[in-house]
Amino acid sequence: MKTNKLVYGLFGLMALASCSDKMDYSETVVKDKDYVIQTFEKVGGFMTDIYNYADYDYGQNFGGGMLASATDESVYSVSGTSIETFYNGSWSPSNAQGSLWSNMYKGIKTCNVVLKDFQDLKFEDFELNADYQQQMYRYENYKWEARFWRAYFYFNLVRQYGGVPVIDPEMAAADVNNQPRKSSDEVFQYIFDECDAVKDSIIKDYSDLGSMALSTAEDGRANNLTVLALKARAALYWASPLFNPSGDKERYHKAALYTKELLDACEARGMKLAAKYADLWSTNNYKDADKKCEIIFGRRIYGTKISSTDPSDNVVESYNYPFGIDMAKASYSASGRNCPSQNLVDAYEMKDTGKGINEAGSGYDEQNPYAGRDPRFELTIAKNGDLWPTAANYKKAALQTYYGGVNAEPLVGATPTGYYLKKLLHGDIDLT
């Protein structure tokens, strides 16, 4: 944990020394334990900082490239970027790309500090405050939140690196970097054990706390459904061929049981599928119960500038709006970067039959290939002839994604697949 210290200039020290032979003062170290434990707010702020280490993938790590563009789901329209590392043979332990390793261990360290240094506090100075019991209720939950997050960080590590060192809160700093790697099975078991230890103790529903509720909303914090979801997802990875090359059926069985436990808990909580697919990424959907009804746990992402010269705060739209919709704008306006592949397009089944397009009796028509597909297709993929984005300034001409079209090759940076991304984007945003 970094310590921020007060620094005094040489001239200032000399001036103070000239006034007195002795000077009694105490420094306040911003993240010192004794400073943090003074109030509920400081401990809560330290705990909430852990949420900043949650990973997300909107192209922020790879020059605009989402991890889908490292797979056969998408093709990145610009060459020479770091996303290519994943498929050109240069990805390795010494060239891992991104900051997942360091960020996850920073998060783990912060969790361990909470669990070691910030337990069994009483906050006696605030016992007469009207909200003392509510604040203590929140504080007592922090240890369960921290343990969930620590398990989450280890899940992100094990799924990418396999076995990793597991760091105990009581380890001396000198010993931390000398820990051997646990096997992947040991790390997964650690995650399962932590989830089991936390699931019945962590707050179940922040919207139904009764007398323990605070005046401010607490949407977005980890609850018991979050813990069950982590356990179920980790079990699915543990049962996958990557970690289960022998095909151990008991792992499949456990993954199914853990998922059933999660689904039953979600049903009991009244969760359901959102009425509209696009509600899952709509503006301020976390404020609308009908739009967030199927989101177990999510990270809110606000617009971030791509560069100091880019006037837009709508980074996802800037990266992925179709190339060529506004050629007069700066290069970052509409970059058309993550382009859905034909493989992804072909994966969408037929709505009426539920069959894949290559299955007999599916109802697929080669002369009208996009008709009758799973409705999510139209909300995910922009194709030739679509009026996209929907902002008035862009709905002047249909997309031309055929070779030689205004949104297509051979223009450098245009889609190499004939498709552009819609999912996650707000089409009503005007970047001009």
Predicted regions: what they are:
Residues 41-48, 52-56, 79-162, 176-189, ...:
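Conserved, well-structured interaction surfaces
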Residues 353, 362-432:
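Flexible, polar/acidic helix-loop-strand segments at domain edges
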Residues 19-67, 93-95, 348-371:
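Membrane-proximal, proline-rich intrinsically disordered regions
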